[in-house]
Structure formats: C-alpha cells, structure tokens
Amino acid sequence: MVRHLVVGDLRVQRIERKGGWRSWTIVWPEGALHAEADRFLRVHDGSGTQKTYAYYLVDHLRWLERECLAFGAVQLRDLERYMGIVGADVHMPLGEPWRVGKRPYGRDASATAASCLKGFYLHQASLGVNVGLGEKLDGTRLPSRVDRRRSLLGT
C-alpha cells in the first residue's frame, strides 16, 4: 500500500482505541473532525467496513468541495453524476474529470461506493438534513454497473 502525507485536504484519520482497537474518521485540513462524516462512520465502529467507507466517503467529500455542493443541496442527479465520474455507467454529462491519473472503480468498488454514499445520505436524512434526497434514495439504487468502455481505456 502506498502511503503519502495529505496536506491541505480532507483526509482519513486512524484513531487508536483501548485494547488495540482502531477506528477511522475524516478530518479537515486543520485537523478538526468532520462531524457529519464521523457520525456516519461511528455507526460502523469496530467493523472492517468503517475503514473502507471512510476512504470512499473522503473521496466523495473532496468532490463535493470541488463542486461547491453542501449536503443539504445534493440531489440524486449529483450522486448519479459522481458515480459516473468514478466509473459507473451513466448516461449524462459528467463534467470535469475527477480522480485524474487513477483508474475508474471496478465492479466491486463501484458497488461499495454506491452503498457507502446511499448509507451516508440516508443517515443524514434521518438527522433531518436533506430529507428529500433521503426519500428519493430510499427507493432508488445508485448506479454501480461499471462502464466497460471506460474500464478498458482506463480513464
């Protein structure tokens, strides 16, 4: 695994717990806890899912910042576009490239990202944030089928 220091951006932070347990959260560049992400990740405390979700969620949160989108303003179409940008097969304009230099998500990664994002926004809706999106997500699947054309090209 390649490790590099992340400076000036949201990042995943490991937290050492008593008894050798580890938890994972997301922090702002100055080191402050990202409260919304932490509340969601705590639901998965002690599971292997927490670390995986933290890395998928931090990528999405960085994308939200670049797109100047707040949680309360995110629409289903924004999530579909994000999934398309990271490799899912969607039929819409995707906008500027994201994750430049990285391969698109494969089938399993795309499904995990969709599950993470759906869980995150349903959790936000349960707290009263962007309830409309939560209602739409409750009966919808985010696109996770891999765009084979992009997978072959590696873009």
What are the roles of these predicted feature ranges?
Residues 1-45, 51-58, 62:
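Basic/aromatic DNA-contact patch characteristic of tyrosine site-specific recombinases
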Residues 36-49, 58-153:
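N-terminal core-binding DNA-recognition domain of tyrosine recombinases/integrases
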